[in-house]
């Protein structure tokens, strides 16, 4: 990825237009085709590289992380990329379509905490080198220039305590003032795209539903002040959940990624911008799904004990029998600044329709702290870790029991990251409510987590709102390890060995305490090379099968002793590829082939990864 090539729209030979000494992480092409802006890390100094080649491979934690810089490349081929001197580490850049300006997102350092919490949008005048900080108020999402180059739209947080970027703001380039479009309401913006100089489309979420909307933006020609001339939009009454969007300014058509309860993400075409517009599906990535029978999926509303209205997505068991109670798998999303939509929710870490086909229900609650219900709702869990937010999960289970669907003695809980934290809490503090737990990359000790996570500022600003040393009791009481004596839930713990976000020691701590107490079965599975979530197909398949196996064993099967450690993946073993290995032949006095060995095979892709 150290070279950039272009190929004509009608095909032909590729042509190299840029190269760099480190990986090119992103680029933007000037509208007139004369220049490229590149994102790449700083090259390693020659003397440092020489020392590394000598074996000096020490890391200076956080200090020696390379900054991502912006480089400019002329398309005429004259010379290599030139460094654009800017303060900070860059992560996103967009050429202004009409002016010699560049919008760049800059963080104070290359660290992930600064990237998440403190990225600011800068408009750089390439003629003078002056960079103007727009000072967006919170977390930063997508950026997009209007086609006339006079407005810059962005998805941002309402302030530094807003847990997730989801507010739509527009900056005028004349006075660098914001037009706040979405601060008052409950909708959460997912993406944005301009179809003309003044029309901005944006899909997003309102609870479990999806919506698609556009604004017609006005701008005073003298003062540059922005306003809203017209709006159109409504929640989607169909089954599609809208995601990323892109626009063609020539005909104002849109391409948008959508998923539904019966298919994973596909590309749709939206023709025109008026009510009753054309809307049709363009791709079909998994045609075999049309032959599958799907269980009923629906939105369930319920109230928490304190009266707060909540909702979640329920997948009923396939071929459900009236009056019969079923096992339930409670899926808890991470964040908690995220949410479940009523679309495709069967993934490698979420059993969904797979569980339904095995005679189990699945419930996906949007507990307090979730996005899609307004900034105020998403902040309700702050300063109250493992408090009412996790009580909401129990209230959801109780509601399903009262509905007559769920057997309260056969409820399992699972989730990753913050959902893993909820699983650890459910398997200790609320252990009397759960017959099985599968915890993934989750927190177990808020005290030690505070010193090992790479997002300390985010944990402070949008979660706890207090530092460890300011309230030790709060952090201790909200830690699952504080409640291990209550453990009765068979717990499967899984974690990536290279997780920088929630250190694997969080799983090791909980495992060791539960193992020593020996009050219920516990197993720990570590994935080498994986971080905060599994990326490799083999790791995902292993996780998916272990999750399903654990839930079936303890919710439907005999329970008791843990299921077998080894997994049957249900895939044929490939023919072994034999390679020669070399050894010293004493008789011949030379290196020669002394044995053959079989190289392991890694599977490529699996059904459990669809839609992830």
Per-range role (PLM):
Residues 1, 36, 102, 149-152, ...:
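Hydrophobic beta-strand positions that form the internal "hydrophobic ladder"
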Residues 1-5, 13, 19-25, 39-69, ...:
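A flexible loop/linker signature enriched in serine peptidases of the S9 family
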Residues 8-12, 74-78, 125-129, 172-176, ...:
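Short loop/turn segments that connect beta-strands within beta-propeller blades
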Residues 37-40, 46-48, 62-70, 75, ...:
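Non-catalytic accessory segments flanking enzyme active sites
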Residues 324-334:
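Short beta-strand element of the alpha/beta-hydrolase
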């Amino acid at each position: 990825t150290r070279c950039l090539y272009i190929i004509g729209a009608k095909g032909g030979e590729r042509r190299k237009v840029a190269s760099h000494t480190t990986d090119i992480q992103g680029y933007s092409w000037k509208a007139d085709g004369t220049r490229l802006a590149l994102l790449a890390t700083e090259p390693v100094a020659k003397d440092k590289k020489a020392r590394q080649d000598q074996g000096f491979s020490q890391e200076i934690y956080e200090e020696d992380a390379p900054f991502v810089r912006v480089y400019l490349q002329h398309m005429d081929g004259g010379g290599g990329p030139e460094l654009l001197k800017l303060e900070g580490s860059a992560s996103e850049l967009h050429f202004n379509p009409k002016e010699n300006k560049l919008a760049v997102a800059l963080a104070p350092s290359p660290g992930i905490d600064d990237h998440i919490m403190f990225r600011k949008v800068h408009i750089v005048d390439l003629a003078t080198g002056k960079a103007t900080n727009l000072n967006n108020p919170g977390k930063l999402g997508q950026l997009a220039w209007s086609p006339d180059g006079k407005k810059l739209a962005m998805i941002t947080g309402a302030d530094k305590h807003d847990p997730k970027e989801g507010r739509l703001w527009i900056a005028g380039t004349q006075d660098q003032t914001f037009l706040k479009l979405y601060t008052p309401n409950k909708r959460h913006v997912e993406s944005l795209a301009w179809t003309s100089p003044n029309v901005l489309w944006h899909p997003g979420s309102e609870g479990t539903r999806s919506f698609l909307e556009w604004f017609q933006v006005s701008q005073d020609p003298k003062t540059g002040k922005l306003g809203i001339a017209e709006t159109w939009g409504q929640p989607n009454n169909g089954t599609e959940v809208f995601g990323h969007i892109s626009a063609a300014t020539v005909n104002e058509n849109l391409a948008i990624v959508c998923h539904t309860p019966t298919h994973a993400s596909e590309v749709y075409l939206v023709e025109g911008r008026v009510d009753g517009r054309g809307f049709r599906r363009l791709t079909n990535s998994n045609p075999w799904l049309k032959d599958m029978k799907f269980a009923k999926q629906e939105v369930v509303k319920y109230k928490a004990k304190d009266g707060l209205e909540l909702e979640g997505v329920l997948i009923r068991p396939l071929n459900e029998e009236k009056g019969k109670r079923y096992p339930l798998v409670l899926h808890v999303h991470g964040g908690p600044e995220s949410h479940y939509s009523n679309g495709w929710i069967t993934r490698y870490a979420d059993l969904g329709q797979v569980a339904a086909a095995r005679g189990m229900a699945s419930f996906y609650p949007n507990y307090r702290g979730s996005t899609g219900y307004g900034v105020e709702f998403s902040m309700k869990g702050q300063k109250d870790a493992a408090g009412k937010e996790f009580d909401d999960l129990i209230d959801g289970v109780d509601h399903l029991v009262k509905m007559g669907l769920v057997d309260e003695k056969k409820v399992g809980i699972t989730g990753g990251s913050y959902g893993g934290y909820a699983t650890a809490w459910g398997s200790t503090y609320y252990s009397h409510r759960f017959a099985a737990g599968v915890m993934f990359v989750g927190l177990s000790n808020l005290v030690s987590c505070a010193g090992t996570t790479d997002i300390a500022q985010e944990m402070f600003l949008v979660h706890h709102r207090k530092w460890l040393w300011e309230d030790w009791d709060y952090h201790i009481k909200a830690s699952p390890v504080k409640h291990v004596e209550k453990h009765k839930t068979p717990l499967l713990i899984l974690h990536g060995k290279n997780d920088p976000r929630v250190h694997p020691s969080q799983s090791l701590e909980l495992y060791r305490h539960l193992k020593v107490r020996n009050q219920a079965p516990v197993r720990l599975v570590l994935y080498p090379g994986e971080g905060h979530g599994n990326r490799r197909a083999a790791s995902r398949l292993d996780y998916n099968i272990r999750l399903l196996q654990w839930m079936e064993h303890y919710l439907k099967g005999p329970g008791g002793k843990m299921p077998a450690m080894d997994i049957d993946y249900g895939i044929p073993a490939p023919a072994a590829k034999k390679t020669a290995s070399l050894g010293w032949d004493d008789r011949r006095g030379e290196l020669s082939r002394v044995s053959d060995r079989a190289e392991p095979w890694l599977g490529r892709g699996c059904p459990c990864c669809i839609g992830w």
